[in-house]
Amino acid sequence: MHLNRRIALGLLVVLLQACASGPKPSQPDLNEAGGGSDWLLPNRDYAGQRYAGLNGITPDNAAGLRPVCTFNSADTSRFAGNPLVWRGKLYLTTRASTYALNAADCTMIWKHEAPGTLNAFQSRGAALKDGKLVRATMDGGLIALDAETGAPVWESRAADATRGEAMVMSPVAFEDMVIVAVGIGEYGVKGWIGAFRLADGAPVWKFTTIPVDGDPAATTWSSSETRARGGGGVWTVAPSIDIDQGLLFVAVGNPAPDFFGDVREGTNLYTASLVVLDVRTGQLRWHRQFVPHDLHDHDLTVSGPLYQVSIDGRRLSMVATGGKDGLLRALDRDSHQEVFSVAVTTRTNADAAPTTAGVHSCPGALGGLQWNSPAFSPRLNRLFVPAVDWCATFRKADQLRYVPGQFYMGGSATADPVEKSRGWLTALDAATGAVAWRYESRLPMVAAVTATSGDMLFTGELTGDFLALDARDGKVLYRHAVGGAIGNGVITYGVGGRQVVAVTSGTATAFWKVPAAPASVTLFALP
């Protein structure tokens, strides 16, 4: 009897050890992602704070940073992803390829090439959970790879690329699901965000950003035909999740056609809106529209970070949100009321409707807040907001024509010469919106920004310069040219006992007027 008990106890110990060492990262790992030394989610944690509790690099020693290594993919397609890091491996996605690298020395561990016919857009990243790395393909597929080997685990069809549906947003893993979305409303399709089963890619729920028949919001459109191709893409890096309340915060893009509003009279919900869903069911909890009847392609792009502040002795739960209209807003997540709104770029003639002759307006369609979210430092109580200062002339077409799978814009937005553009990195008081400092770049700032407990900020410029700044005053402490434009992820993590900064570069796109360069990642650390 005692022998049997010892055998049973031994088997129990083995089983417990097997569970503890099973596929990772697990849900508890992701829930605590903000406090670890890895980088497990597109914006580091579910709240989207892009804040790392790492202080090996500080304002006192940042000038001593040096490049450690560079991985060059030789892929010159558009590149705008945020890497993930888990236990010494760095995962990186380009338009068609997925890489696992050694997070200390850039050595490639494996590479996977996505099948299918890809369109001209890009991947913003992948989701990592339970031993699977899940990414979207530009022909509407979802692929799960074994995170250790790169071998395919499953594939599923999530979107219809023949209609113009393109999945750009980085997938986000939560519990037994992976959340993805359809962006690029300019093709005249209806945007959506949905969840698929992590185990096999089967659909779980879908929320359509253009209201369906029976939804009271359908009355904000002039006809069901217009709603059928109403836009509302979700295309920026990733939504935020309040894991305590089970809420998913989603930034929804512009209505379609972009510049020809005659065919879509009304406010056009849920476009240019912050939409808050039950993360487990996709049911709408609340929403707030910021650009009713948008006529300037002024997508809402930012749905985080989620953070807390004290105002007049009250503790408020906040969400930062904003978009291509150049305004950064903060809302009380409980009352849904706006606490502050701050212009982080030039705004002139911003509400003037396009005409056939043309109307000059700021920001242009390439201005304001783009695909990367602000960072939040709880230590300094500040938001750090990258933005684009670039105006355009908006023209309405003489007539409108819809062809499935082709651009459906109803006009144009001609950007000013790139020499007239610039970028801003603005530090704001997270409770009041008061500006603490601003850094000006001679080109648009679209790269990710990461804050640390060492009072550092890491980001990059389209000039190709990696920047390390003092988060307290915005002083540039270190600058290094990496050889390609930086419009992508800039993250920090711990490996081998030291803090490392990974800088992705190689943005190749006609929109941002930068030379083509291969998708690359360069690691920086102190000697």
Model-derived segments and spans:
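Bacterial N-terminal signal peptides that target proteins for export
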Residues: 1-8
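C-terminal motif of bacterial Sec signal peptides marking the signal peptidase cleavage site
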Residues: 16-18
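Beta-propeller blade signature
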Residues: 145, 191-203, 267-282, 422-430, ...
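Beta-propeller fold recognition
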Residues: 322-372, 376-407, 479-482, 492-498, ...
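Structural signal for beta-propeller blades
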Residues: 98-99, 142, 193, 274, ...
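Aromatic (tryptophan-biased) beta-strands that constitute blades/sheets of beta-rich domains
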Residues: 22-73, 107-116, 151-160, 202-211, ...
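Repeat-blade elements of multi-bladed beta-propeller folds
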Residues: 39-43, 76-96, 118-142, 166-190, ...
